[in-house]
Each structure stands twice: as C-alpha cells, then as structure tokens.
Amino acid sequence: MNDIKNKIFKLLDKVEIDKVDYNDLENLLKTILSEDLDQESIYAFLDLLHFSNVSKLIADNDSNYWALKISDIIKKYNFHTGQLLFQRAKRYKEKPALITIDGENKKIITYNKLWNDLVLCAKSINSISKDKEIKIGVLSANQYKSALIDLCCLSFGYRVIPIPLNSTSEHLSYILNETEINVLFIGGEKAVQLWNAVQKYHNIKIVDINDIRRIKGNSISWEYFQDLGEKNNNINYELNIPIQDMKWTTTIMYTSGSTSNPKGVKFNQIM
C-alpha cells in the first residue's frame, strides 16, 4: 500500500472515532494537489469528505477554500462525467442509479445497466455519424432515453444541445443553424410536429426515440440506432474513456425567448 493510501486510511480511522484533525485533512489535500496520484487514491480521499464530522470541520474553517480546491482536484485528475459514472458503476453495480416513473409503474435502472446503456449509445453515435466533430441535438420530452443521450455526450466527449420543446419553428431553425447539429434525437408528439415544420430546410440525421414513424426526412428508429452500436466493436469504451478538456464546451442550453432569437448558454465539465 502506498504512502498516500496509508495516510488516507489513518485519517479514516480518526474520522470514525471523531478524532480527525483539520491540519491533517488540509495537509492531505495539499499533497493530492501537488503530486500525481492514482485515481483510486483520490476517490478514497473524496469519500472522506462525505462524513458528517468532516463536512462540519470544513464548514467551521473555510468551505469556500475547499470548494475551490475540490474543483482543482476535478480538473487535475480529469474527473469528468464519464469517469465518475464509470467509478460509480464499478462500486455500486446493481444498486439503483435512476428510477423512471410512467403512471403508477416504476422502473429501477441500476448503475450497471446505466453504464452499459451509455457505452452502447456511444458506439451507436460513432456509427451513425462520420463527421469529425459530432454535435448532438435533443428535442424530446423528459424520458430515460433522452437523459441517456445527454449523459452519453457528457461521458464520451460529444457536444450536446438540448432544445426547448416550447420553441417556435423559427427558433428551432435558428438553433439548428447556429449550432450546426448533425444528429438530432426526436422524442414525443410535440417534438415531431416542431421538426416536421422545418424539416425541408435542414439536412440532419434523425433518430426517432419513440418510434412514432411520422417524422419527415431521413430518420432511423431507436432500435436501429442501438443495433448500430451492437455491431460496433472497434473500441473497448470501458478502457478508453477519453481524457477531456474540462474547459471545452460540452453543452449549449438555449432560452426560449418569445421575441428575439434564443440565447445559447455554454457549459463545460467544470460549470
């Protein structure tokens, strides 16, 4: 066991008997930021911060300082969405990650299933688009499949643009043109109506999330989209979670202004 892990486990012993010293905690933080350590050690340190007595200790000293330093850890060790979800899947496996609700029916999505679905989506996206820079649009009511696409993009480094369902057809066209979306996921009746109104002005690959089959233009079903991923064995995605530029724009979210053109707000893995 390396020296840093020894320090973490010694600190954990103190945490469990409520004898943790703030200086020990801060010195460990400084070591993590000054050295290059393995990710498992960093996860072990971050786990310490979940204990209520540690959280109180931080709050009693300088919580703003710690918030900034934890942000530095995220950047230094490239803890983007994909890395964190993969770590959670390895740790929690068959424990619930999400619960979907349809009327009175509830469906539990485990961490393993969520991660496997994300990997399949990434394979499918790479198969459907040969563009150098893949830009994903999501025009859909809230549902598991649209959330899956969003998380997949954040995990594997595709830019994603969620489009408000209350957009006008003019605003939809504006967003499609400005962001240069090359794959658009459409889900729900309202989304289909919006797209069909502007389809003739855009040449975009469409994925019919809910298999509505009334979408105009060149569309494929969700099942066919997943089949593309099943046939794509070029990359082992679990061993090739990409290192991402944490400041690169991962998401552009648009306001749905009633008069002027929608405004895009950019987000990266940090904010």
Annotate the PLM regions:
Residues D150, S167-A197:
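Conserved ATP-dependent adenylate/AMP-binding module captured primarily in the ANL superfamily
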Residues G157:
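Structured binding elements
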Residues K93-P96, Q226, E230-Y254, N261:
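Conserved pre-ATP/AMP-binding loop-to-beta segment of ANL
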Residues I136, C153, L184, T249, ...:
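Conserved S/T- and glycine-rich ATP-binding loop of Class I adenylate-forming
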Residues S55-N61, W66-A67, L84-I109, I128:
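AMP-dependent adenylate-forming
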Residues I108-N112, T250-M271:
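Conserved AMP-binding A3 loop
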Residues N2-Q83:
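Flexible, non-catalytic linker and terminal segments flanking ANL/adenylate-forming cores
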Residues E94-S129, I134-L151, T168-S173, I270:
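Conserved AMP-binding/adenylate-forming core of the ANL superfamily
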